[in-house]
Amino acid sequence: MRGHEPRSSSSCAACKLLKRRCTPTCIFAPYFRSSDLITFAKVHKVFGASNVSKLLGEVPEEQRQETVNSLAYEAEVRLKDPVYGCIGAIASLQKKMLELQHDLAVARTRLLAHSGVNNSQVSPLDDSPELAAFLDLVPYSDLMLLDGSTNLDAYLYDLGQPPFV
């Protein structure tokens, strides 16, 4: 674990930035090496050295490295997006996930239309055995090429598999 490595003789990033002498009991030294000056500067700008020091003092030693990693990530994101921070990143990923789920439903609908499966029996959102068999059979890269003009039966026969009925 990084917090238990022997220290070099130079000051930690926190003491360098704060222009103070680094003591052997410095709470920042195990987690902000002298080479991590930019990381500590971001954490200091967002949270403040005093708050980080108090926080690290309250966290059990075995969890401090993860705490520092979390603070560094939050500070990085907060500086990029001061209003929303990590929540903005999460919301963006959730929006992207919904878009991809929609695209998947559209692709499944098109596949069902081309496969000859009765659309009233199978929903494009269901994981039907017929659809699962087709998706396992067709390479992912080829799914992107199916645009409605492709003869699906011929494609399946080219793979050596009969079309499912």
Swiss-Prot record:
- Start and end residues of each LOB domain: 10-111
The UniProt entry, under InterPro entries, shows: LOB
Q: Which domain of life is it from?
A: Eukaryota
Q: Name one Pfam family in it.
A: LOB
Q: Which PANTHER family does the record associate with it? A: LOB DOMAIN-CONTAINING PROTEIN 21 (PTHR31301:SF24), LOB DOMAIN-CONTAINING PROTEIN 4-RELATED (PTHR31301)
Family membership noted in the UniProt record: Belongs to the LOB domain-containing protein family.
The entry's protein name is LOB domain-containing protein 21
Classification lineage: Eukaryota, Viridiplantae, Streptophyta, Embryophyta, Tracheophyta
